[in-house]
Amino acid sequence: MHAKSLTELRAALAAKECSAVELAQLYLKRIDAARDLNAFVHVDADLTLAQAKAADAELARGAGGPLTGVPIAHKDVFVTRGWRSTAGSKMLENYQSPFDATVVARLQAAGMVTLGKTNMDEFAMGSSNENSAFGAVKNPWDTHAVPGGSSGGSSAAVAARLAPAATGTDTGGSIRQPASFAGVTGIKPTYGRVSRYGMIAFASSLDQGGPMAQSASDCALLLNAMAGFDERDSTSLERDDEDFTRHLGQPWTAGSDAARPLAGLRIGLPNEYFGAGLADDVRATIDAALKQYEALGATLVPVSLPKTELSIPVYYVIAPAEASSNLSRFDGVRFGHRAAQYGDLLDMYKKSRAEGFGPEVKRRILVGTYVLSHGYYDAYYLQAQKIRRIIAQDFQEAFKSCDVIMGPASPTVAWDLGAKGDDPVQMYLADIYTLSVSLAGLPGMSVPCGFGAGANAKRPVGLQIIGNYFNEARMLQVADAFQRATDWHKQVPAGV
């Protein structure tokens, strides 16, 4: 039962093969048995089973929708009433929100049952889920490896089938990279598609929530429930409701046939995504996936994204600048960690923040404060914003000759736990293929497409699919066609 997709689980509930309570109990037992992975930071069986009972009551009345009674885990960056909401930080280790984030509320309104809160890099700052105040998360495929970050708890939970789906957030790649490392499917929607209300902020012009699950079809179902305008989020976009499942299983064009369902699809391959720095085993796996797309009828087209290499310095100016402002609210006064001993008010601020924040968060606050300071704002922050606009223009130029862009989600497979902890720059370089997508506000997703080679033979590789603004339904169609022709997304770690 635990290996079933969301659609299969909902069908099992409708057929009375199990109840929502029994399903929740199954996953709670699996979570408890896999505590060594450290994927979850907070589980409350009573709260979960209460939601499951309510879902069973809905189903008994013949009511409910396509997700009623199906369990989900939430990244601990979404505030969730009843559960602690920590953002992976000591600063918020005992914080309980009086309200639900819009994403949480919408999924609960769709009938989903919350299993608990997943581990994450502190305030979503990291690429390995080693920056959490609650300990590192292990990759279920190889427990010596990282699961990616910052949504590493969510990716590990879905990969180990501790939950059929999970929420994540993506600021510079934090859905796509962990999805790649853990062999699951994850999508970052267009910026503004999913409400940020109740999402603990890192970098407000970049943060975006999205689903992580086994397949593109599962992600489409989840996005149906998650997306939509929210007047409480000033960056939320007013658009008509959309069915993200509407193209699944359909031919790309009227001239496509069953053997070549993607005939007419043009896939752009950026030269910059296949150059120096891309590991040989990742390149080989991505090449094999692209050949599969050609077999499905797609055409490969060379494109260029010339400012790709600048996305790292641009991101690491803009994101820390916004973080230094957003995290200024955590001062030990209204909420958050407060130092036990201090002199005056200023001393309390200093000690509370020094004790509450981890080293990576402190590093980014310092960088952000510096680039916003007098004399450096124009040289760094303003210049970064100008290049950000050029990066977005490069994508629009590329989309003139293709429908979607593809490439690796990460230049390597997951690295060993602790391998990059002493070298933050090497950690930052791991996001080179995802950062520009976030800076442009475009939708991007990662789908499992194989594994590394040699010593990395147990470590998954993800194919990144990038679409133009509001093109999620077509991206999901493209990913779904690949998953109908392959079974990479159905493979699970040993023992699962």
UniProtKB/Swiss-Prot annotation:
The keyword RNA-binding does not apply. PROSITE patterns: AMIDASES. InterPro entries: Amidase, Amidase_CS, Amidase_dom, AS_sf, GatA. It holds the Pfam family Amidase. One of its GO terms (biological process) is translation. Keywords: ATP-binding, Ligase, Nucleotide-binding, Protein biosynthesis. One of its GO terms (molecular function) is glutaminyl-tRNA synthase (glutamine-hydrolyzing) activity. It is an enzyme of class 6 (ligase). Its EC number is 6.3.5.7. The active site is at residues 75, 150, 174. Heterotrimer of A, B and C subunits. Allows the formation of correctly charged Gln-tRNA(Gln) through the transamidation of misacylated Glu-tRNA(Gln) in organisms which lack glutaminyl-tRNA synthetase. The reaction takes place in the presence of glutamine and ATP through an activated gamma-phospho-Glu-tRNA(Gln). This is Glutamyl-tRNA(Gln) amidotransferase subunit A. The gene is gatA.
